[in-house]
């Protein structure tokens, strides 16, 4: 099929605006799957994706559509994730397209991630087509939302297609608009091969499956290929397309989107955004935009039973096959034993990895509080990255600590603006911009990432009754007045409870945390002191009172010296017990850090 009859497009939308349902309808309309094979959210292959109603991995479908002009077009639909944690995947999916459907819920209006992804599309030169979805809802107000799109995003929405993916209204119109407005791919079949990896995942039977967009050249089975970022070489076995079932093809030529299987054993070789070329006739330079995915949030994962350590290593290694952004390395904690320090893209990513470990691999896990990476400049001029607070050098060796700052874009209805501004100020935010668009307000803030990973998202939702939406991107490392807060139980530091906090809130955080720990640590046969310390200074102390056996119960009357002797004996025993006694710290105590709110 010639390039003039090919259209590559993706769908961008905020979570819950009906992106996956619309993809289902388009596949059904073009006859991609029979009635029997059709199921809800057909492109979301993971159970977790369906349950949470989110798309995590990018998927594609090649559809044949007979347009009103009588021609049969091939439409390549690339489904993108909508969540802020997966924004790099979105930018790769969009760079493989010439057009994008901007799906906006006609009852809710424009939200933060819609805008962020739409700007990414415009920067990449992608033709954006607005679609108003869910017009069958009683609360739908398409005219207001069309105005919002023009006002906030700045694209003409007067002819926006009005559709309802649930009932099937407007699906034919969407396909016609795609054919008319999305430009055909421009690629040279005779040039050296250049193919962009949009996504890759691990299949138990064939190894790594790569989803690619061929930009120039032709890719056939038995070709010798090379990845330009990692430099590794492989021999292709199969090439083909998803309809969304996989169908083998004799070749993929310029403008096509399809899959490549080349007997690759690990995902690290096929990184998202890398360029594939031929060994015999290589391209001069790779496609732009590739970057190695950096972990933003770190947390310790420890097995509850220490003999599960190897099982956890296996589970993480298997997950990494399907999730190149997950990084982990072994670490030892005095309090929790052997475990792993894992790096994630964001809190949702961390949540999903944890849930998949528990669900798919039956692991019982203890998770420490999430932290971010700090840049520490030492007195000798060297700079080190610290992702675990317990690894922070001594204060005497530190020149300054720099924390990661993000720029957050928040959309919120005007009646909740006050609450959101108060919240951002509590989190040490600096306001950059504030714009009113109809009833919506757009706020832009610089916020320390450390404050965001704790509980910012939950609080944002609760102060705005769920209406606020958030998108953020990393900005820079900035020096801050930060200190390390240690928790001591029975005069021993518990490394897994250490935190890096701002000096202004450190005393309050220390008191709150000590009080919380007092409630959670079970009572022992001796007094247990819980202390919060900054360096050598103790800033807060709470006591967990001892349980006491009544040793005088057997003395009926009798001499007072007899009673004193028994009490002294008990006292000496308690003193001895305190010296050798171990205090078991329950899992809830490690999560208590998350619940310590700011003032």
Swiss-Prot record:
Catalytic activity entry: GTP + H2O = GDP + phosphate + H(+)
Described function: Required for accurate and efficient protein synthesis under certain stress conditions. May act as a fidelity factor of the translation reaction, by catalyzing a one-codon backward translocation of tRNAs on improperly translocated ribosomes. Back-translocation proceeds from a post-translocation (POST) complex to a pre-translocation (PRE) complex, thus giving elongation factor G a second chance to translocate the tRNAs correctly. Binds to ribosomes in a GTP-dependent manner.
Coiled-coil ranges (or none): none
Keyword Transferase in record: no
Ranges where the tr-type G domain occurs: 4-186
InterPro entries, alphabetized: EF-4, EFG_III/V, EFG_V-like, EFTu-like_2, G_TR_CS, LepA_C_sf, LepA_CTD, LepA_IV
Localization per record: Cell inner membrane
EC number: 3.6.5.n1
Name of the gene: lepA
Swiss-Prot/TrEMBL keywords: Cell inner membrane, Cell membrane, GTP-binding, Hydrolase, Membrane, Nucleotide-binding, Protein biosynthesis
Protein name: Elongation factor 4
């Amino acid at each position: 099929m010639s390039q003039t009859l090919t259209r590559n497009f993706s769908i961008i939308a905020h979570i819950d605006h009906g992106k996956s349902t619309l993809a289902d309808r388009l596949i059904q309309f073009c006859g991609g799957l029979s009635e029997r094979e059709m199921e809800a959210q057909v492109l979301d292959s993971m159970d977790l994706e369906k349950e949470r109603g989110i798309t995590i991995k990018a998927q594609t479908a090649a559809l044949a559509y007979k347009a009103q002009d009588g021609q049969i077009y091939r439409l390549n639909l690339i489904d993108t994730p909508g969540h802020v944690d997966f924004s790099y995947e979105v930018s790769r999916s969009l760079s493989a397209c010439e057009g994008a459907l901007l799906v906006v819920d006609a009852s809710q209006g424009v939200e933060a991630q819609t805008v962020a992804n739409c700007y990414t599309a415009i920067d990449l030169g992608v033709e954006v087509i607005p679609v108003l979805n869910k017009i069958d809802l009683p609360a739908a107000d398409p005219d207001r939302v069309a105005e919002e799109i023009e006002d906030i995003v700045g694209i003409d929405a007067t002819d926006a297609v009005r559709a309802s993916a649930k009932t099937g209204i407007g699906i034919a119109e969407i396909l016609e608009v795609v054919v008319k407005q999305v430009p055909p791919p421009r690629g040279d079949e005779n040039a050296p091969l250049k193919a962009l990896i949009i996504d890759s995942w691990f299949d138990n039977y064939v190894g790594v499956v790569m989803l690619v967009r061929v930009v120039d050249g032709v890719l056939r089975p038995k070709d010798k290929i090379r990845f330009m970022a990692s430099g590794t070489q492989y021999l292709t076995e199969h090439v083909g397309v998803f309809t969304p079932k996989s169908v083998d093809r004799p070749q993929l030529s310029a403008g096509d989107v399809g899959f490549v299987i080349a007997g690759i054993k690990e995902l690290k070789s096929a990184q998202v955004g890398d360029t594939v070329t031929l060994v015999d006739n290589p391209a001069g330079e790779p496609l732009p935009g590739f970057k190695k995915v950096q972990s933003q949030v770190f947390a310790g994962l420890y097995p509850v039973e220490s003999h599960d350590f190897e099982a956890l290593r296996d589970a993480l290694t298997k997950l990494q096959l399907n999730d190149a952004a997950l990084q982990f390395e072994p670490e030892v904690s005095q309090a929790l034993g052997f475990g792993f320090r894992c790096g994630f893209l964001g809190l949702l990513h961390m949540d999903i990895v944890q849930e998949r470990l528990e669900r798919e691999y039956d692991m019982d896990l203890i998770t420490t509080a999430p932290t971010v990476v700090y840049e520490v400049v030492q007195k000798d001029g060297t700079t080190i990255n610290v992702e675990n607070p317990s690894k922070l050098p001594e204060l005497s060796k530190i020149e300054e600590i720099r924390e990661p700052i993000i720029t957050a874009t928040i959309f919120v209805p005007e009646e909740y603006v006050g609450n959101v501004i108060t919240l951002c100020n509590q989190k040490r935010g600096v306001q950059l911009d504030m714009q009113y668009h109809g009833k919506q307000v757009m706020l832009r803030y610089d916020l320390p990432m450390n404050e965001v990973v704790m509980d910012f998202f939950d609080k944002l939702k609760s102060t705005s009754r769920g209406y606020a939406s958030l998108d953020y991107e990393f900005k820079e490392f900035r020096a801050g007045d930060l200190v390390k807060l240690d928790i001591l139980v029975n005069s021993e530091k518990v490394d897994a409870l250490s935190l890096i906090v701002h000096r202004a809130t450190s005393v309050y955080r220390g008191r709150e945390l000590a009080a919380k720990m007092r409630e959670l640590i079970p009572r022992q046969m001796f007094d247990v002191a819980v202390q919060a310390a900054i360096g050598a200074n103790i800033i807060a102390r709470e006591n967990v009172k001892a349980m006491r056996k009544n040793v005088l119960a057997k003395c009926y009357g009798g001499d007072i010296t007899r009673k004193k002797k028994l009490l002294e004996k008990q006292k000496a025993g308690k003193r001895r017990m305190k010296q050798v006694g171990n205090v078991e710290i329950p899992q809830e105590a490690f999560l208590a850090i998350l619940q310590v709110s700011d003032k």
